[in-house]
Amino acid sequence: MHVLRDYLGSLGEHTQMRPPVAFDFGVNTHIGKYCFFNFNTTFLDVAPITIGDYVFVGPGCQFLTPTHPINVQDRINFWEGALPITVGNNVWIGGGAIILGGVTIGENAVIGAGSVVTKDVPENTIVAGNPARVIRTIDPQQRPAHPHQYSEQEMTQAQEFYARLEADNF
């Protein structure tokens, strides 16, 4: 992670990325704290990509800011534009999702695996599909009685394990 800090626009504390990870430029990518990116994440950051805190990204996700013209002559001239991507806090993005330029994903949203997000996603919303469509809204107060199946000891062991990985610059 120390190497990434030198090349990215900004990288929050306790954020983890599982290799391989790819960036177009890196300097246009800004990632908050306590985020997790699984294997094979791609950031084509021709325009800024801004990701909030506590964002969890499944394997094989892509953040694609470039835009390309439909006009043949513009393509022949290698014209390329770009639109920014913004992801709010506490967002969960399922594996294989593609987030296109010009999209803002609101806080607490969930993006279904394999979705292609072409339009803004409101906060507290679950979207899925190609193109991604609203499945339902999330009540932030609604929470299962037992949010996870692990004991407090198991959670502590997992946190210590990930802290060791981070300390070893994994």
Predicted features and spans:
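Glycine-centered loop/turn positions within well-structured domains
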Residues: I49, E123-T125, R133
